[in-house]
């Protein structure tokens, strides 16, 4: 087994076939062989999608590999379990434990364990990352492995907040980063918000983004998804995962994407609903100091803007005196030419007139 092993955990009702979803796409992009360099766990409540005669070899292979968690022995792979595993998976997260057992079985089958395990997951898949980390920490053979976790909107679902292995990070987690969607309003989609009390050891980083529960995990559907995909690619590569054709974005690119988000903010704010709102509403109270401000989306957006347009940033922060007007006007002209969406967004919110 290599020095770094990567584990991907799909969200509820999603599996390796959903290549437009970032977790499945990460598995597709990761260099090496499945179960040697990386592995993917299908999400609770998911099932293999039928593919037609015109399907590509990749589509047929993914369909054959996709299994509903809870219907196979996690070690032998032999068919077992409840015919209601799919429904139970959607409702309660049934199958997450099977994914933990399967991951541990893959690791224990190797002679040489990795030094580092990187994980990424969405929704209950992110919670599965927590559970795997706890399982690794409790096993003497795997306890010393360093763990890094990227979570997309970690949501355990009702009835699961009382289990510490689903809402806390153990001591073996070195780095934890999460995308948290600030406009999800369904009460049953309450996220796990790791704080210093629950994670005194690891380095943590949070990206609070507009949109609903799934907004950040579909890279081709919106700008938030593309930004989030870039961020998870960068996180995994930093900690040793090798990716084919990783997404690269410059600070200017990020400013332009965030600017488009600002222009379309009203649409993002509508995306956190659906029929399940009938089960209860709850606004997410997140520590995003930029959430109710007029322009910046989050601290990541502000930092990219400050690096890319330092003169304009200084003017926004301190104002512009007469002596600095020529430099400011020159910087503004450059911004308009090189980052037109950013310029437009500043006009739209009334910062520029």
Label each region the model flagged.
Residues 1-353:
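Active-site- or binding-pocket-proximal scaffold segments within functional domains
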